[in-house]
């Protein structure tokens, strides 16, 4: 999803839309959104690129989407858990704030038996590592279950990736969550770390 699969153009991808949303919210700040997503990669493959593709840019904030490809390929949840914690610790050691992004609510993902366990694992890792979590699965499930949108409204024809509308909404929600977190007093954020694990 980060790489832009499902979008009609690069400008409609989630990172591109996020850059637009953040610049609207922070007009007096220089903001750069770097897209380092590669389609199809799993957690360990992303971590192999951390040094060259992530740490070399000295990011202040890393939005890390994890879990989907591992679930689709029936990978070991135990191995994924260890990799996830290691990856978070590496990003934190590099001085970056971290937001985890869990899998999408889409037919191809929902069909896998271990999706719920993966969602729970990522949420627990965020809590244990005291990093933020954007609950994409819950947001998209709300669109379907509560707002009664059809999958075709926010998922591309491949039944996996989001479409332009879905990416635009995701970017808007993420930008709003980042803006809210940035406005928190430091003392308040430190006193209530659990609040940082429920974005949006």
Where are these regions (language model features)?
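Short glycine-rich His-centered loop
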Residues: 1-9
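Alpha-helical cap/lid subdomain in secreted, periplasmic
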Residues: 16-32, 41-200
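Short, solvent-exposed turn/loop segments enriched in Gly/Ser/Thr/Pro and often Arg
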Residues: 37-39
């Amino acid at each position: 999803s980060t790489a832009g699969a499902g979008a009609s153009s690069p400008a409609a991808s989630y990172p591109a839309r996020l850059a637009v949303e953040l610049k609207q919210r922070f007009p007096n700040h220089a903001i750069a959104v770097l897209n380092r997503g590669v389609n199809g990669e799993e957690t360990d493959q992303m971590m192999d690129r951390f040094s060259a593709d992530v740490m070399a840019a000295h990011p202040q904030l890393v939005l890390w989407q994890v879990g989907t490809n591992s679930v689709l390929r029936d990978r070991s949840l135990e191995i994924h858990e260890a990799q996830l914690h290691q990856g978070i610790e590496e990003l934190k050691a590099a001085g970056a704030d971290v937001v985890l992004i869990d899998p999408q609510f889409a037919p191809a993902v929902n069909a896998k038996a271990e999706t719920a366990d993966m969602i729970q694992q990522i949420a627990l890792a965020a809590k244990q590592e005291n990093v933020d979590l954007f609950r994409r699965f819950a947001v998209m499930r709300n669109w379907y279950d509560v707002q009664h949108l059809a999958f075709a409204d926010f998922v591309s024809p491949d039944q996996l990736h989001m479409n332009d509308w879905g990416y635009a909404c995701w970017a808007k929600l993420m930008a709003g969550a980042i803006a809210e977190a940035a406005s928190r007093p430091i003392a308040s954020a430190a006193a209530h770390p659990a609040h940082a694990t429920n974005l949006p």
